[in-house]
């Protein structure tokens, strides 16, 4: 007798058929394709490729130091390998040519065997990984902007000098002008010439400033009129 399947049972049967079909196609791909089959069988064996790397034949120093290194390591077990290499290098230099000659002959024999075993061998040194530079240089626009601001400040606060004042007095006033940040603080620094220094604050009235300027007028004749009007205009 035939059984009528419900909608849920029919849906489950279709899903199972789809799963079986996907598994069958994946197995066929692994068996039919030689490259995929090689990947399936040799998965995880990529690290073993480094073991097949052909080593260089030993030279005379390596032939001599092979036994000497063992002796030094047994006599000094706490010595590091780098220190042992330094000692062996110094001892090798102290040997005469007659003492080195047997090791040169052995090295030539090993090189001949190496050429016979690996006729197409070529030495390929491993390249060291370059460290990534994390520090980034500042953009060139920042330095050029800073220089332009400095030049602009020099043009703004530069003023000439005459015979009435010395260069030292003007250089001192220039330093005071550069160290100030507000116009009123600049005027207060200018109103302190040295021996007869007066105290000027932001609370002083325009009349007091005018009186002080009239009293100190001989010392500040060299200041330009445009600068004084720009700083003392209310």
From Swiss-Prot:
Residues 121-143, 184-203 are annotated as: Disordered. SUPFAM superfamilies: HMG-box. Pfam families: HMG_box. Keywords: Activator, Calmodulin-binding, Cytoplasm, Differentiation, DNA-binding, Nucleus, Sexual differentiation, Transcription, Transcription regulation. The keyword Cytoplasm applies. One of its GO terms (cellular component) is nuclear speck. It comes from the Eukaryota. The keyword Repeat does not apply. One of its GO terms (molecular function) is RNA polymerase II cis-regulatory region sequence-specific DNA binding. It is found in: Nucleus speckle; Cytoplasm; Nucleus. InterPro entries: HMG_box_dom, HMG_box_dom_sf, SRY, SRY-related_HMG-box_TF-like. Disulfide bonds: none annotated. Residues 54-122 bind DNA. GO terms for biological process: cell differentiation; male sex determination; positive regulation of gene expression; positive regulation of transcription by RNA polymerase II; sex differentiation. Belongs to the SRY family. Interacts with CALM, EP300, HDAC3, KPNB1, ZNF208 isoform KRAB-O, PARP1, SLC9A3R2 and WT1. The interaction with EP300 modulates its DNA-binding activity. The interaction with KPNB1 is sensitive to dissociation by Ran in the GTP-bound form. Interaction with PARP1 impaired its DNA-binding activity. Transcriptional regulator that controls a genetic switch in male development. It is necessary and sufficient for initiating male sex determination by directing the development of supporting cell precursors (pre-Sertoli cells) as Sertoli rather than granulosa cells. Involved in different aspects of gene regulation including promoter activation or repression. Binds to the DNA consensus sequence 5'-[AT]AACAA[AT]-3'. SRY HMG box recognizes DNA by partial intercalation in the minor groove and promotes DNA bending. Also involved in pre-mRNA splicing. This is Sex-determining region Y protein.
């Amino acid at each position: 007798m035939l059984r009528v399947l419900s909608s849920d049972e029919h849906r489950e049967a279709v899903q199972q058929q789809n799963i079986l079909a996907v598994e069958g196609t994946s197995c066929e791909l692994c068996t039919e394709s030689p490259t995929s089959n090689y990947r399936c069988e040799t998965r995880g064996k990529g690290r073993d490729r480094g073991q097949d790397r052909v080593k260089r034949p030993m030279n005379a120093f390596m032939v001599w130091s092979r036994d000497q290194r063992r002796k030094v390591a047994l006599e000094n077990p706490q010595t590091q390998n780098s220190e042992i290499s330094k000692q062996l290098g110094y001892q090798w230099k102290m040997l005469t040519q007659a003492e080195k000659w047997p090791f040169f002959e052995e090295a030539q024999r090993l090189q001949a065997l190496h050429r016979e075993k690996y006729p197409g061998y070529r030495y390929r040194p491993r390249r060291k990984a370059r460290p990534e530079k994390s520090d980034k240089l500042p953009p060139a626009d920042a330095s050029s902007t800073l220089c332009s601001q400095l030049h602009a400040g020099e043009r703004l606060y530069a003023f000439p000098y005459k015979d009435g004042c010395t260069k030292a007095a003007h250089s001192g006033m220039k330093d005071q002008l550069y160290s100030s940040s507000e116009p009123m603080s600049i005027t207060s620094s200018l109103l302190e010439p040295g021996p007869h220094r007066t105290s000027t604050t932001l609370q002083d009235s325009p009349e007091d400033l005018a009186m002080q300027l009239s009293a100190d007028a001989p010392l500040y004749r060299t200041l330009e009129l445009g600068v004084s009007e720009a700083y003392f205009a209310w």
